[in-house]
């Protein structure tokens, strides 16, 4: 959410009624947690924090699934990260969490699937809120990095299949890919930005977007790191990059 809020004026803090109206009108909304939506979750998290159970898989499951189920959804796709840059450091723990969330969610009548995706290395080329928004816009215009585009198509394809909006995953993923290249995904994103207080005019040109995000700034500095020897970059530690 903090990435989206790097867009000037954009707010994820909207009321439940406004949230529901926006979904009815344009088909999507991205909002922060509300005190009147699963209010027990915040209290439970406070208890987890002081009892050393933040990493408890059953409690993580209840926290995540309760918010999704409270929205009254019929289908859900979960992107469960694992690796150095993720909360779950190994694929075994991520798989255990995935199975727990899928089981509970399906038991509540929500058609749910989970994808395990690695966060050992950064996804895409950018790190940082504004830079990642810029890269997301490039992806919505069909010009994004291949790994990010693939993840978007996999998650979107599974959701279309799960919701019955496509006959199978392949058709769903193809439709998502088409939306990235025909401009419809970007257009829908602009609708959401405008509905949640952001300035859609920022996205009219690359220069206006760079200025709006504070990236086109003379105070920005860059440094060059010279390799000590000739070779290939074999690995990039996502957590080390995040901590810079």
Task: Pin down the residues of each PLM region.
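Active-site cofactor/substrate anionic-group-binding motifs, chiefly glycine-
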Residues: 1
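Well-ordered secondary-structure scaffolds
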Residues: 53-60, 67-70, 74-244
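Phosphate/pyrophosphate-binding betaalpha-module
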Residues: 5-71
């Amino acid at each position: 959410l903090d990435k989206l809020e790097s867009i000037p004026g954009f707010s994820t803090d909207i009321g439940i009624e406004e949230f529901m109206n926006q979904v009815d009108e344009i088909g999507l909304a991205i909002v922060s947690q509300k005190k009147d939506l699963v209010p027990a979750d915040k209290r439970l998290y406070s208890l987890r924090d002081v009892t050393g159970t933040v990493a408890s898989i059953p409690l993580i499951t209840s926290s995540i699934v309760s918010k999704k189920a409270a929205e009254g959804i019929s289908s859900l796709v979960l992107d469960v990260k694992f690796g150095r840059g993720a909360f779950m450091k190994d694929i075994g723990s991520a798989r255990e969490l995935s199975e727990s969330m899928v089981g509970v969610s399906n038991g509540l009548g929500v058609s749910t699937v989970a994808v395990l995706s690695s966060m050992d290395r950064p996804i895409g080329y950018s790190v940082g809120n504004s830079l990642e928004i810029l890269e997301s816009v490039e992806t919505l215009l069909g010009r994004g990095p291949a790994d990010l585009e693939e993840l978007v198509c996999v998650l979107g394809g599974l959701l279309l299949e799960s919701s019955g909006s496509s006959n199978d995953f392949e058709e769903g993923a193809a439709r998502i890919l088409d939306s990235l290249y025909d401009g419809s995904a970007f257009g829908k994103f602009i609708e959401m930005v405008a509905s949640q207080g952001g300035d859609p005019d920022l996205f009219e040109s690359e220069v206006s977007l760079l200025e709006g995000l504070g990236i086109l700034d003379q105070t920005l500095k860059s440094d060059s790191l010279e390799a000590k020897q000739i070779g290939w970059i074999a690995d990039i530690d996502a957590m080390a990059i995040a901590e810079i």
